[in-house]
Amino acid sequence: QRVMIAMATVCRPRLMIADEPTTALDVTVQAQVLKLLKHINQKYGMTIVLISHDLSVISQICDRVVVMYAGRIAEAAPTQVIMTAPAHEYTKGLINSLPSMERKGSDLPCIPGHVPSTEEKREPCPFAPRCALADDICRQQEPPRRMI
């Protein structure tokens, strides 16, 4: 990972896209990679688009988060807002399923249902079939975008 990051930064681009840069790394190496990315961002002013399914990694390094579900933006906000006051039920489910010391030894909550395949017909809100708060409006029209 570090070699790839070095190769990606040698020409000092203004943007780096890091797709799952910490996947399959042990926590020590993961911390080193995150520290390196943070250093590159701060020293060179390089924008880093971090693509990850790991919210604990995202919360350590990102200023803003865009949560996607079934190819659509579910929510976008500053990281602190996403982590402390998520607005979308999918984001809430992701955060609730993070391991924590308070729940040590207990099963992690999971989001019921399944992620739709690309062939499945989707509701205007693709999360509606899995959402406990979904009502008719969720199945009839796409939720409006609003600033958070």
Q: Locations of the language-model features?
A:
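Short, flexible, glycine/charge-rich loop motifs used to bind or transfer phosphoryl groups or to couple energy/partner
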Residues: 6, 39, 55, 115, ...
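Short catalytic/signature loops enriched in Gly
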Residues: 78-148
